[in-house]
Design a protein with these regions (language model features):
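Single, function-defining residue in the core of a domain
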Residues: 2-117, 125-132, 137-468
Length: 468
């Protein structure tokens, strides 16, 4: 039996909260002073218009740049204060969906060689200096990123490297809090916490049981297995899965991965069991989980077989249900793309600031900027027919249209697909037949030109008015 992954439903225009400007993403920000709030609005727009450039280049002018540096250095300004209004805006988008996947992951930010930055910690080797970033990204099953729900950064001494599993447990606790908040506010959205192998922690499984025992609602979870755990029925998870009947096959396109892994088509067989796990330490309850084995039986010659074991609290009995959970897990790739945009597009590892606290404040701005690029990319792919004014300001899309088409813009906003392709063409996208939708790199480069186009069109209008 061969069965492709379930087709996703395409959301309609009413599904989305408009995200016209980066400044609106931090609407309601409270940095303790109206002038600081105003500076934050200006700064995120300036950085967002030139995300690949240094802060002085993006801001422009010594006085403006000094004001930006002063904001990042101010003790009343903190990363969570900057991100909080974006979290709130993201929550409003989350409420409009029946299922939202909350993917978490940790990435290193390497500042080795920048010894003048005060407060850096060690990374995986004692001579590597930097900090860690652990965001929670809200993603729909259609792979559209709705925004950040949480984000933490930290530094550590080398000897504390093994103590960071607590970040994953705390992350799940935070997702449960958001699920409870949604319930309190009358929203029926189902949240599914998602993590890769680093999140395979029995404490997370037990945490959900304890929350439910208190009579509170808890978030569901879907985690890739790292440990071949003991079960209460005897034997380990893997051996029991291999004995389970095959539900069928699925076929999907695997994106390019780390190292030299190429993008390719993958066909996997699916097996599933429901099994009680033996607690990993005293004091933890027995937790019954669903385990799904997705195994590539016949990989291409020279390629390693793609296989995963996924664990979840959700019931999975049919091929359709197992396929859905695997499709959800593949959505986790969006957080990897987010990290790529943050590092390669926003170049956050090149920040030249005096203290790690200022780095963290700058990271808060750049995370929102990186999310918007990811949102544009995936929204354009999944919903190309939506009007572009959902995500572009009027002067933005009109300026891009004028410069590209050399004609007056239409009264009705063009589609997202048309405008994003125009933007990406200024980032190297050739828009040839069969090229598909632009990727995030060409979009973030093209977005940097949009600001210049807007300024040029506005300057031309001023000159015309003066002549009249």
């Amino acid at each position: 039996m061969n069965n492709n992954l379930p087709a996703v439903s395409v959301p309609n225009e009413s599904t989305f909260v408009e995200t016209c400007t980066l400044a609106e993403e931090i609407s309601g920000i409270d940095l303790g002073d109206k002038r600081r709030n105003s500076r934050a609005f200006t700064m995120i727009e300036q950085l967002g218009s030139q995300p690949s450039n240094s802060i002085p280049t993006a801001i422009g002018g010594w006085s403006e740049t000094q004001s930006a540096y002063n904001l990042l250095a101010n003790e009343q300004v903190g990363a969570q204060k900057i991100l909080e209004p974006h979290y709130n805006t993201t929550l409003q988008r989350v409420k409009q969906h029946s299922v939202v996947l909350l993917a978490q992951d940790t990435t290193e930010l390497d500042y080795t060689g920048k010894s003048d930055i005060v407060g850096l910690g060690t990374l995986n080797y004692e001579n590597r200096r930097g900090l860690y970033l652990h965001p929670t990204l809200a993603i729909t099953p259609e792979r559209i990123s709705l925004g950040l729900m949480d984000s933490w950064s930290w530094t550590r001494p080398f000897e504390n490297a093994d103590k960071e599993s607590i970040r994953w447990v705390e992350g799940y606790e935070r997702v449960c809090e958001i699920q409870q908040q949604l319930q309190t506010e009358g929203a029926s959205t189902q949240l599914v916490y998602m993590a890769d192998r680093e999140g395979d922690l029995y404490d997370i499984f037990a945490k959900r049981e304890r929350v439910m025992q208190r009579g509170e609602i808890a978030a569901d979870w879907l985690i890739r297995s790292k440990h071949d755990r003991n079960t209460e029925e005897g034997g380990k998870i893997r051996s029991l899965l291999e004995k389970a009947p095959c539900l069928g096959e699925i076929t999907f396109n695997l994106p390019k991965g780390r190292g030299n892994r190429k993008a390719r088509s993958v066909t996997q067989t699916l097996r599933t069991i429901s099994i009680p796990l033996s607690p990993s330490k005293d004091g933890l309850p027995v937790v019954t989980v669903t385990a799904i084995l997705a195994q590539e039986e016949l990989p291409p010659k020279g390629e390693k077989p793609i296989q995963w074991i996924l664990l979840t609290n959700l019931t999975v009995q049919t091929l359709e249900e197992a396929s859905e959970k695997l499709d959800w897990y593949l959505c986790r790739w969006q957080i990897e793309v987010f990290f790529k945009i943050l590092k390669s597009g926003c170049k956050v590892e090149e920040l030249q600031l005096e203290h790690v606290d200022r780095i963290e404040n700058a990271l808060a701005f750049y995370q929102i900027i990186a999310w918007r690029v990811l949102y544009l990319t995936m929204l354009g792919r999944e919903c190309p027919e939506l009007p572009c004014d959902l995500v572009f300001e009027k002067q933005e899309w009109q300026a891009v249209y004028i410069v590209t088409k050399k004609e007056h813009p239409p009264e009705t906003p063009p589609s997202i697909d048309e405008i994003v392709r125009m933007v990406a063409s200024y980032g190297g996208f050739l828009n040839r037949k069969g090229d598909g939708f632009p990727g995030p790199q060409t979009i973030w480069i093209g977005l940097q030109r949009c600001r210049d186009f807007v300024l040029g069109v506005e300057a031309q209008k001023v000159l015309i008015e003066r002549r009249l």
